UniProtKB/Swiss-Prot annotation:
<feature type="transmembrane region" description="Helical">
    <location>
        <begin position="62"/>
        <end position="82"/>
    </location>
</feature>
<keyword id="KW-0472">Membrane</keyword>
<dbReference type="GO" id="GO:0008137">
    <property type="term" value="F:NADH dehydrogenase (ubiquinone) activity"/>
</dbReference>
<keyword id="KW-0830">Ubiquinone</keyword>
<comment type="similarity">
    <text>Belongs to the complex I subunit 4L family.</text>
</comment>
<comment type="subunit">
    <text>Complex I is composed of about 45 different subunits.</text>
</comment>
<protein>
    <recommendedName>
        <fullName>NADH-ubiquinone oxidoreductase chain 4L</fullName>
        <ecNumber>7.1.1.2</ecNumber>
    </recommendedName>
</protein>
<keyword id="KW-0812">Transmembrane</keyword>
<feature type="transmembrane region" description="Helical">
    <location>
        <begin position="3"/>
        <end position="23"/>
    </location>
</feature>
<dbReference type="Pfam" id="PF00420">
    <property type="entry name" value="Oxidored_q2"/>
</dbReference>
<keyword id="KW-1133">Transmembrane helix</keyword>
<feature type="transmembrane region" description="Helical">
    <location>
        <begin position="28"/>
        <end position="48"/>
    </location>
</feature>
<dbReference type="InterPro" id="IPR039428">
    <property type="entry name" value="NUOK/Mnh_C1-like"/>
</dbReference>
<keyword id="KW-0813">Transport</keyword>
<comment type="function">
    <text>Core subunit of the mitochondrial membrane respiratory chain NADH dehydrogenase (Complex I) that is believed to belong to the minimal assembly required for catalysis. Complex I functions in the transfer of electrons from NADH to the respiratory chain. The immediate electron acceptor for the enzyme is believed to be ubiquinone.</text>
</comment>
<keyword id="KW-0249">Electron transport</keyword>
<keyword id="KW-0520">NAD</keyword>
Amino acid sequence: MDLVKYLTFSMILFLLGIWGIFLNRKNILIMLMSIELMLLAVNLNFLVFSVYLDDMMGQLFALFVLTVAAAESAIGLAILVITFRIRGTIAVEFINCMKG
């Protein structure tokens, strides 16, 4: 297993996620997808180091991060659908007008 290739790929995925957030700050759906891409890059790091060091903790952390990411996606998409139904748009500049 070539560790440098996997870590480089993971770094590229993480940087693409950061770039997606900074490039498109108007659409919250793309921001959520970019955050998911960043979490997948972190998971890849956990899995690569888990295999490289022959330790199961990295795989357990990756499973935990996937669980949290799934919950975060479900809540984020639910808020997104409700916001679209109420406001008619998913632009980020109107999100701060939420009542709570």
